[in-house]
């Protein structure tokens, strides 16, 4: 039984994510040979890459940003190892990331949030045959598939402390935070979850 089939039963059906505007590459304008903040924001940010098992192809991601919308969009590209035949194989308003080659290089696995939460998908190296593999009740933040394709290690957030609503079920809309000890970090947010590995 594949890891995808095992995880399919981990959660219920997700609500479809809202379609946002597609954020694509912007024209970079350099005036007077000076790099400006606008030019920097127009550049795509290259993400993680994966080399195919035969060493002939490279899959990688690029994020494009929209300053007015204050958000980004990440897409998957595939090219030959020598840099030729560079092609964008996804074009969606969602986030595609953590791309890797599976099934001997015949498929690409990746994470996407197009159904409202980050789940594992697969597709052909040309972008066709997109298929959701997991239906985990939460966001998958990272993963690794065993060489035989039968086991999946994935990372997801788990609660580290009870929330106010957990402690007081009769106050489900309460948003206050009860502090009984000193903070142990200087960051500007309350840490209520932590990354945890799971195996399926």
Q: What annotation goes with each model-predicted range?
A:
Residues 55-59, 89, 105-109, 133, ...:
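Hydrophobic beta-strand positions that form the internal "hydrophobic ladder"
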Residues 11-13:
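Bacterial signal peptide processing site
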Residues 16-23, 157-200:
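Predominantly five- to eight-bladed beta-propeller fold
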Residues 59-66, 108-115, 153-159, 188-191:
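Beta-strand C-termini and the immediately following turn/loop, strongest in propeller blades
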Residues 6-9:
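C-terminal motif of bacterial Sec signal peptides marking the signal peptidase cleavage site
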Residues 38-74:
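Beta-strand-rich domains and repeat architectures in extracellular enzymes and scaffolds
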Residues 22-45, 71, 79-97, 112, ...:
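Multi-bladed beta-propeller domains
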């Amino acid at each position: 039984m594949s890891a995808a089939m095992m995880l399919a039963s981990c959660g219920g059906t997700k609500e479809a994510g809202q379609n946002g505007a597609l954020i694509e590459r912007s024209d970079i304008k350099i005036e007077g040979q000076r790099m400006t903040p606008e030019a920097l924001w127009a550049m795509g940010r290259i993400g993680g890459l994966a080399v195919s098992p035969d060493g002939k192809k490279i899959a990688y991601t690029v994020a494009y940003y929209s300053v007015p919308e204050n958000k980004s969009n990440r897409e998957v590209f595939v090219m030959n190892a020598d840099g030729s035949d560079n092609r964008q194989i996804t074009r969606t308003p969602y986030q595609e990331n953590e791309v890797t080659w599976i099934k001997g290089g015949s498929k690409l696995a990746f994470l996407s949030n197009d159904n409202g939460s980050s789940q594992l998908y697969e597709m052909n190296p040309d972008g066709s045959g997109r298929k959701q593999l997991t239906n985990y009740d939460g966001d998958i933040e990272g993963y690794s598939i065993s060489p035989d394709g039968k086991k999946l290690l994935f990372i997801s957030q788990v609660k580290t402390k009870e929330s106010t609503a957990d402690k007081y079920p009769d106050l489900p809309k309460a948003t206050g935070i009860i502090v009984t000890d000193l903070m142990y970090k200087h960051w500007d947010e309350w840490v209520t979850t932590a990354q945890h590995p799971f195996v399926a």
